Amino acid sequence: MSLKSILVVGAGGAVGLEIVRALCARGADVTATYRTPRNGAAAAIAAAGGRAVRLDLADRDAAQMAIEQAGGVIFTPILTVSAPAAALLRPGQAAVFFSSNNVAVDPQAEVYAALLAAEKRVAAAAPQAAILRPTMIYGYPGDGNLSRLNAAMRRWPATPLPGDGRGLQQPVYFRDLARAAVDVLFDAGRHGAICAVAGPQAVSARDLYEAAAIAAGAPKRFVPIPVKTAAAALGALERAGMRLPVKAAQLRRSLDDKTPRGEVILTETLLAEGLSALAAAMDGGALDAQPAAS
C-alpha cells in the first residue's frame, strides 16, 4: 500500500493537528484519531484537513482495523502508550513513534527506563518503524513547558532559576516537530532509525529564561534556588501526597545537559521566534500565525 493514505493516532492535540496539516499539504488522505471526546476535537481535525475518527489504542480490534487500512502511521501518544500497537503493523509498513530525548539524558529514571523498554519493544515488533526523541516541546498554550514559564513570569515579579542557570536545553518548536515526523515517515532512509529532534540552537537555562521573559514582556529578574535542597523539599511534599506543578525529579534534571544525543534532526524555528509566537497565542492571538523561520 502506498503512503497516500496515512493514519495519525492521537491527533486531538496541538502536535497531532500540525501533523495532519503537514500531511494534507503533501496531498495525503489523512485519517486522524482522537481518544478523549473533548469539545471541538473532531471539528479541529476536519478543519486541518483530516477525517476524524474516535479511537482508543486499548481497543485492539479497532486499532488493528484502522492500521490495516493505512499506508503509513504516525503515533503521537508517548511510546509507553503506543508501543503495543507496533505489533499490529504490517511487515514493512512505515510508522513513526514518539519517545523522549531524556531517554539518553537520564536513562536510570523510572519514566525514561520505561520509555527505553518501549523503544526496544517497538524495534522488535516493527523494525521498520522510526522512533523520534524530541527535546523539550514548546510553542502552544498548555505545552506543559514554556507556556507554564510564560504564565508564571507574567504573574510574579521574579522567577526562580534552578541552580546556576548553566544547564543546557535545545527546545523544539511544536510545528517543526510535526513537520519532522512527516518528513521521516516519507523518508525510507530513516525508517528503523532512532532520531533526536531538536531546535537549531542550544541555550543555557539562564538564556532560555531571559528569552522567555522578553517574549512575555516580563521583568528579567531571576532568583537562583539550590536544586538539591529544593528537590528534597519537593520530594517530601510528593511523598505526603501533594500534587505539585514541578516534580523533584524534574528539578534535579534541570542541571543536566539536555542537548540531543545520537542521530539528530535539527529544525528551523529560532527560540526567540517560537517564544514570540507562543506569547501571542497565550494573549489570544491565532495559533495559525507562523514564526518567520518556520
Give the location of each predicted region.
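Conserved Rossmann-fold cofactor-binding substructure of NAD(P)-dependent oxidoreductases
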Residues: V53-A70
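A conserved pocket-lining segment of Rossmann-fold NAD(P)-dependent short-chain dehydrogenase/reductase
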Residues: A151-V172, V184, A188-H191, A196
